[in-house]
């Protein structure tokens, strides 16, 4: 995994009240120290604090900002992170990003912040996938499903099954190594019950995945009927 420091605009590229430029990586604090002018040096600031000041490119003042300082590992990516809250005009946000890149960061690739969060153990694959699902949710049900996955509902189920499998695998291996002291009488029935239970849970997960896809993508439906049969009324109800 690359250890360089990345930066990107975290808000939409339209004129708005506020724009955010995020920096993540080992050099995040060194970079912000080069371009931020305020009451204190942000590399010395406490984690999870916000500071008022200005972003400067040499002697030129770019914008008046609030800067959030977050130290690893208690961040989204698991790395040192800085978020620059500036005015949301597209030009000024891009100018702030250009200044950050000029001072040592590189432009983040699409999805790279989430990728780093995954690689640094801040989330598992199901949660990483849920991030984009939350962003692209088109209805309340899809959002609720995606948020549940992001909060770890799928992860917990998989982890419980994994623990169950590891427990019984360890028991079987121990029994094979020491058959004189470990009895396996009746264990076959227990193992069968456990295995069947895990298979049912896996089938439920697969089924819920299919249901989730319908919630997120919807169902293509055609309403067909004779003229004045009530097709429009039915569509309006739906």
Question: What residue spans do the PLM features occupy?
Answer:
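A glycine-rich (often HGG/GG-containing) alpha/beta subdomain
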Residues: 1-144, 148, 152
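Conserved G1/Walker A P-loop phosphate-binding module
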Residues: 15, 22-24, 34-39, 171-238
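Long, non-coiled-coil amphipathic alpha-helical linker/lever segments
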Residues: 122-201, 205
